[in-house]
């Protein structure tokens, strides 16, 4: 989930880049994006916006669930206390990189499923494509099958249903 826009976000807030590197990014990014668009690339930029409360819930869910704890890095825990700085960095990044040729589209993302579906729908509305939905299919009745002798279930090995 990392991108070169991290220069203006994580790297800025966490001190991983110099002021000169940040300024270079802010100047070069829109120039590069314009070049891509002039070259015929459809450039779509999406920002999945999560509220402070939702982010806190997601952090807590990761802490509470051992199978998801790996998703929570020490960097996440440090960044958690810098929510306001990250918000300001995002606003500054938008100010420098939200250009008419390649605007940012914000996706309300507190609900992951809705966010993904809304983003997919929006993306498809921005990219020309041919509808390739196959025609409807009607299943004909199956012909009668001859009797089949199957081995007894108690002679087979099954993976336990740990998640019924």
Question: Whereabouts are the PLM-identified features?
Answer:
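A glycine- and Lys/Arg-enriched "phosphate-lid" helix/loop adjacent to the NTP-binding pocket
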Residues: 9-28, 36-88, 135-139
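NTP-dependent small-molecule kinase module
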Residues: 88-91, 95-164
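Beta-rich strand-turn-strand
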Residues: 1-2, 6-10
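A structural signal for short, well-ordered beta-strand segments and their strand-loop junctions
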Residues: 1, 43-47, 106
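Anionic group-transfer/hydrolysis microenvironments
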Residues: 3-4, 47, 51, 110
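Short, active-site-adjacent cap segments at secondary-structure transitions
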Residues: 6, 53-55, 113-115
């Amino acid at each position: 989930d990392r991108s070169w826009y991290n220069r203006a976000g994580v790297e800025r807030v966490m001190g991983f880049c110099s002021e000169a590197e940040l300024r270079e990014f802010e100047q070069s990014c829109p120039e590069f994006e314009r070049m891509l668009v002039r070259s015929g690339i459809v450039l779509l930029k999406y920002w999945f916006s999560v509220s402070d409360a939702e982010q806190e819930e997601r952090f807590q869910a990761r802490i509470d669930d051992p199978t998801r704890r790996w998703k929570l890095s020490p960097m996440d825990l440090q960044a958690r206390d810098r929510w306001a700085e990250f918000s300001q960095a995002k606003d500054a990044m938008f100010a420098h990189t939200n250009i008419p040729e390649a605007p940012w589209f914000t996706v309300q993302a507190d609900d992951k499923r809705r966010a993904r579906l809304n983003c997919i729908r929006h993306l498809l509305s921005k990219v020309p494509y041919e509808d390739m939905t196959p025609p409807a299919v009607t299943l004909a009745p199956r012909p009668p099958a001859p009797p089949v002798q199957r081995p007894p279930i108690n002679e087979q090995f099954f993976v336990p249903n740990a998640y019924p």
